[in-house]
Amino acid sequence: MLKIVILLSAVVCALGGTVPEGLLPQLDGRIVGGSATTISSFPWQISLQRSGSHSCGGSVYSANIIVTAAHCLQSVSASSLQVRAGSTYWSSGGVVAKVAAFRNHEGYNANTMVNDIAVIRLSSSLSFSSSIKAIALATYNPANGAAAAVSGWGTQSSGSNSIPSQLQYVNVNIVSQSKCASSAYGYGSEIRNTMICAAASGKDACQGDSGGPLVSGGVLVGVVSWGYGCAYSNYPGVYADVAVLRSWVISTANSI
Protein backbone atom coordinates (compact mmCIF):
# COMPACT_ATOMS: atom_id res chain seq x y z
CA MET A 1 0.00 0.00 0.00
CA LEU A 2 1.34 3.38 -0.89
CA LYS A 3 2.50 5.63 1.88
CA ILE A 4 1.45 9.24 1.68
CA VAL A 5 4.65 11.12 2.21
CA ILE A 6 4.25 14.56 3.74
CA LEU A 7 7.58 16.09 2.91
CA LEU A 8 8.65 17.18 6.39
CA SER A 9 12.26 16.08 6.80
CA ALA A 10 12.71 16.28 10.47
CA VAL A 11 12.40 12.57 10.83
CA VAL A 12 12.32 9.40 9.04
CA CYS A 13 8.73 8.31 9.00
CA ALA A 14 6.55 9.87 11.63
CA LEU A 15 2.86 9.47 10.92
CA GLY A 16 0.77 12.41 9.79
CA GLY A 17 -1.75 13.00 7.08
CA THR A 18 -3.91 12.83 4.08
CA VAL A 19 -6.65 10.89 2.58
CA PRO A 20 -7.13 7.23 1.67
CA GLU A 21 -9.17 6.16 4.65
CA GLY A 22 -7.31 4.03 7.12
CA LEU A 23 -3.94 5.02 5.68
CA LEU A 24 -1.86 7.38 7.77
CA PRO A 25 0.85 9.22 5.87
CA GLN A 26 4.44 9.72 6.86
CA LEU A 27 6.21 12.95 7.53
CA ASP A 28 8.89 12.86 4.88
CA GLY A 29 10.77 15.05 2.31
CA ARG A 30 13.94 14.70 0.14
CA ILE A 31 15.70 15.51 -3.09
CA VAL A 32 15.74 12.25 -5.07
CA GLY A 33 17.80 11.96 -8.24
CA GLY A 34 19.32 15.38 -7.75
CA SER A 35 22.78 16.93 -7.73
CA ALA A 36 24.90 18.84 -5.24
CA THR A 37 24.86 22.60 -5.64
CA THR A 38 25.91 25.78 -3.83
CA ILE A 39 23.87 28.44 -2.09
CA SER A 40 24.85 31.06 -4.66
CA SER A 41 22.66 29.19 -7.16
CA PHE A 42 19.72 29.15 -4.71
CA PRO A 43 20.37 32.16 -2.44
CA TRP A 44 16.75 32.29 -1.22
CA GLN A 45 17.05 28.79 0.30
CA ILE A 46 17.21 28.50 4.08
CA SER A 47 17.41 25.63 6.56
CA LEU A 48 14.69 25.75 9.21
CA GLN A 49 16.09 24.10 12.32
CA ARG A 50 14.57 22.72 15.48
CA SER A 51 16.96 22.70 18.43
CA GLY A 52 19.86 23.10 16.00
CA SER A 53 18.97 20.22 13.67
CA HIS A 54 17.68 20.62 10.11
CA SER A 55 13.94 20.15 10.01
CA CYS A 56 12.56 21.79 6.86
CA GLY A 57 13.41 24.15 4.07
CA GLY A 58 12.11 27.62 3.43
CA SER A 59 12.49 30.66 1.19
CA VAL A 60 13.62 34.21 1.93
CA TYR A 61 10.74 36.59 1.16
CA SER A 62 12.29 39.69 2.75
CA ALA A 63 15.10 40.52 5.17
CA ASN A 64 13.11 39.21 8.13
CA ILE A 65 10.36 37.05 6.58
CA ILE A 66 10.62 33.38 5.55
CA VAL A 67 7.99 31.36 3.67
CA THR A 68 7.69 27.67 4.52
CA ALA A 69 5.07 24.91 4.90
CA ALA A 70 2.46 24.91 7.67
CA HIS A 71 3.05 21.23 8.34
CA CYS A 72 6.63 22.08 9.33
CA LEU A 73 5.38 24.21 12.22
CA GLN A 74 2.99 21.92 14.04
CA SER A 75 3.45 21.34 17.78
CA VAL A 76 6.52 23.54 17.98
CA SER A 77 7.32 26.84 19.68
CA ALA A 78 9.10 29.76 18.05
CA SER A 79 11.73 29.70 20.79
CA SER A 80 12.96 26.26 19.64
CA LEU A 81 13.44 27.38 16.02
CA GLN A 82 16.22 29.05 14.10
CA VAL A 83 17.04 29.66 10.45
CA ARG A 84 20.40 29.24 8.76
CA ALA A 85 20.75 31.36 5.63
CA GLY A 86 23.54 31.99 3.17
CA SER A 87 25.22 28.60 3.46
CA THR A 88 25.62 25.62 1.16
CA TYR A 89 25.71 23.46 4.29
CA TRP A 90 22.82 23.23 6.72
CA SER A 91 25.07 22.68 9.74
CA SER A 92 27.69 25.41 9.30
CA GLY A 93 28.48 28.70 7.61
CA GLY A 94 26.25 31.57 6.62
CA VAL A 95 24.25 33.27 9.34
CA VAL A 96 21.86 31.96 11.97
CA ALA A 97 18.79 33.94 13.03
CA LYS A 98 16.34 33.04 15.76
CA VAL A 99 12.63 32.82 14.99
CA ALA A 100 10.59 35.53 16.70
CA ALA A 101 7.15 34.37 15.56
CA PHE A 102 5.36 32.33 12.93
CA ARG A 103 1.84 31.98 11.58
CA ASN A 104 0.32 29.02 9.80
CA HIS A 105 -2.41 29.58 7.23
CA GLU A 106 -5.70 29.61 9.13
CA GLY A 107 -7.19 27.25 6.56
CA TYR A 108 -4.43 24.64 6.80
CA ASN A 109 -5.85 21.14 7.15
CA ALA A 110 -3.51 18.30 8.09
CA ASN A 111 -5.90 15.71 6.65
CA THR A 112 -6.26 17.21 3.19
CA MET A 113 -3.06 19.33 3.15
CA VAL A 114 -4.90 22.34 1.75
CA ASN A 115 -3.31 25.74 2.45
CA ASP A 116 -0.01 24.16 3.52
CA ILE A 117 1.86 27.43 3.87
CA ALA A 118 3.28 29.50 6.73
CA VAL A 119 5.18 32.72 7.34
CA ILE A 120 8.07 33.11 9.79
CA ARG A 121 9.33 36.40 11.22
CA LEU A 122 12.99 36.42 12.24
CA SER A 123 14.27 38.13 15.39
CA SER A 124 16.95 39.91 13.34
CA SER A 125 17.12 40.95 9.70
CA LEU A 126 19.26 39.14 7.15
CA SER A 127 21.87 41.11 5.23
CA PHE A 128 21.48 40.44 1.53
CA SER A 129 24.51 39.30 -0.48
CA SER A 130 25.40 36.91 -3.29
CA SER A 131 24.42 34.05 -0.96
CA ILE A 132 21.30 35.58 0.63
CA LYS A 133 18.60 37.01 -1.62
CA ALA A 134 14.84 37.34 -1.49
CA ILE A 135 12.72 35.65 -4.11
CA ALA A 136 9.54 37.11 -5.59
CA LEU A 137 6.21 35.31 -5.26
CA ALA A 138 4.59 34.02 -8.43
CA THR A 139 1.60 36.04 -9.61
CA TYR A 140 0.37 33.27 -11.90
CA ASN A 141 1.15 29.62 -12.46
CA PRO A 142 3.60 28.53 -15.14
CA ALA A 143 2.29 26.45 -18.01
CA ASN A 144 1.98 22.70 -17.70
CA GLY A 145 5.40 21.23 -18.53
CA ALA A 146 7.35 24.39 -17.69
CA ALA A 147 10.88 23.88 -16.36
CA ALA A 148 11.34 24.28 -12.60
CA ALA A 149 13.82 23.40 -9.87
CA VAL A 150 13.42 22.28 -6.27
CA SER A 151 16.21 22.42 -3.70
CA GLY A 152 16.88 21.28 -0.16
CA TRP A 153 18.82 19.14 2.28
CA GLY A 154 16.32 16.30 2.50
CA THR A 155 17.20 12.63 2.42
CA GLN A 156 18.15 11.19 -0.94
CA SER A 157 16.08 8.02 -0.77
CA SER A 158 12.63 7.33 0.61
CA GLY A 159 12.64 6.40 4.29
CA SER A 160 16.31 7.22 4.82
CA ASN A 161 17.52 8.52 8.18
CA SER A 162 20.46 10.51 6.91
CA ILE A 163 20.49 13.83 5.11
CA PRO A 164 23.27 15.31 2.98
CA SER A 165 25.34 18.11 4.45
CA GLN A 166 25.49 19.91 1.10
CA LEU A 167 22.52 21.55 -0.60
CA GLN A 168 20.93 19.46 -3.37
CA TYR A 169 18.67 20.40 -6.26
CA VAL A 170 16.71 18.68 -8.98
CA ASN A 171 15.17 19.90 -12.23
CA VAL A 172 11.51 19.02 -12.64
CA ASN A 173 8.57 20.04 -14.82
CA ILE A 174 5.39 21.72 -13.68
CA VAL A 175 2.23 19.60 -13.65
CA SER A 176 -0.78 21.91 -13.51
CA GLN A 177 -3.42 21.50 -10.82
CA SER A 178 -5.98 20.26 -13.35
CA LYS A 179 -3.52 17.83 -14.95
CA CYS A 180 -2.34 16.55 -11.57
CA ALA A 181 -5.94 15.86 -10.54
CA SER A 182 -6.78 14.15 -13.84
CA SER A 183 -6.77 10.46 -14.71
CA ALA A 184 -3.22 10.89 -16.04
CA TYR A 185 -2.04 10.55 -12.43
CA GLY A 186 -3.20 8.72 -9.34
CA TYR A 187 -4.24 11.50 -6.97
CA GLY A 188 -7.67 12.40 -8.31
CA SER A 189 -9.72 14.60 -5.98
CA GLU A 190 -6.94 14.78 -3.39
CA ILE A 191 -5.43 17.59 -5.47
CA ARG A 192 -7.11 20.82 -4.38
CA ASN A 193 -7.01 24.36 -5.73
CA THR A 194 -4.26 25.43 -3.30
CA MET A 195 -1.88 22.85 -4.77
CA ILE A 196 0.40 22.58 -7.78
CA CYS A 197 2.49 19.58 -8.82
CA ALA A 198 5.87 18.92 -10.41
CA ALA A 199 7.52 15.78 -11.70
CA ALA A 200 10.45 14.29 -13.60
CA SER A 201 11.36 10.66 -14.10
CA GLY A 202 13.17 9.37 -11.03
CA LYS A 203 13.39 12.83 -9.46
CA ASP A 204 11.47 14.46 -6.61
CA ALA A 205 11.55 16.20 -3.27
CA CYS A 206 11.28 14.07 -0.13
CA GLN A 207 12.19 13.89 3.64
CA GLY A 208 13.80 17.13 4.77
CA ASP A 209 12.83 19.24 1.79
CA SER A 210 9.38 20.17 3.12
CA GLY A 211 8.71 23.88 3.13
CA GLY A 212 11.42 24.48 0.56
CA PRO A 213 11.19 26.30 -2.76
CA LEU A 214 9.86 25.19 -6.13
CA VAL A 215 11.14 27.85 -8.52
CA SER A 216 10.24 28.48 -12.15
CA GLY A 217 11.10 31.53 -14.21
CA GLY A 218 13.00 33.04 -11.30
CA VAL A 219 9.99 33.24 -8.97
CA LEU A 220 8.64 31.09 -6.15
CA VAL A 221 5.80 29.01 -7.58
CA GLY A 222 5.50 26.29 -4.94
CA VAL A 223 6.32 25.24 -1.38
CA VAL A 224 7.27 21.57 -0.91
CA SER A 225 4.26 19.93 0.73
CA TRP A 226 3.43 16.23 0.22
CA GLY A 227 3.23 13.25 -2.11
CA TYR A 228 2.84 9.47 -2.31
CA GLY A 229 6.35 8.20 -1.73
CA CYS A 230 9.13 10.05 -3.50
CA ALA A 231 9.65 9.99 -7.27
CA TYR A 232 6.86 7.46 -7.84
CA SER A 233 6.08 7.60 -11.56
CA ASN A 234 2.32 8.08 -11.25
CA TYR A 235 2.47 10.48 -8.30
CA PRO A 236 4.14 13.86 -8.85
CA GLY A 237 5.42 15.89 -5.91
CA VAL A 238 2.71 18.17 -4.54
CA TYR A 239 3.40 21.77 -3.54
CA ALA A 240 1.44 24.62 -1.99
CA ASP A 241 0.45 26.88 -4.88
CA VAL A 242 2.13 30.23 -4.23
CA ALA A 243 0.21 32.17 -6.89
CA VAL A 244 -3.08 31.11 -5.30
CA LEU A 245 -1.84 31.80 -1.76
CA ARG A 246 0.14 34.94 -2.60
CA SER A 247 -2.26 37.47 -1.08
CA TRP A 248 -2.25 35.57 2.23
CA VAL A 249 1.56 35.53 2.32
CA ILE A 250 1.78 39.27 1.64
CA SER A 251 -0.84 40.28 4.20
CA THR A 252 0.59 37.95 6.84
CA ALA A 253 4.15 39.14 6.24
CA ASN A 254 2.94 42.69 6.83
CA SER A 255 1.09 41.89 10.04
CA ILE A 256 2.97 39.15 11.87
Curated annotation (Swiss-Prot):
Propeptide residue range(s): 23-30
GO molecular function: serine-type endopeptidase activity
PANTHER family according to UniProt: AT26814P-RELATED, POLYSERASE-RELATED
Any GO BP annotation: proteolysis
Annotated GO CC locations: extracellular region
Name used for this protein in its record: Trypsin alpha
Signal peptide: 1-22
EC number annotated for this UniProt entry: 3.4.21.4
Family named by the database record: Belongs to the peptidase S1 family.
Keyword terms of this UniProt record: Disulfide bond, Hydrolase, Protease, Secreted, Serine protease, Signal, Zymogen
Residue span, Peptidase S1 domain: 31-254
Reaction equations catalysed: Preferential cleavage: Arg-|-Xaa, Lys-|-Xaa
Site (Required for specificity): 204
Active site: 71 (charge relay system), 116 (charge relay system), 210 (charge relay system)
Subcellular location field: Secreted, Extracellular space
CDD domains according to UniProt: Tryp_SPc (cd00190)
Superkingdom, natural source: Eukaryota
Pfam families from the UniProt entry: Trypsin
Signal as UniProt keyword: yes
InterPro entries: Peptidase_S1, Peptidase_S1_PA, Peptidase_S1_PA_chymotrypsin, Peptidase_S1A, Trypsin_dom, TRYPSIN_HIS, TRYPSIN_SER
Species per Swiss-Prot/TrEMBL record: Drosophila erecta (Fruit fly)
Entries under SMART domains matching the protein: Tryp_SPc (SM00020)
Cysteines paired by S-S bonds: 56-72, 180-197, 206-230
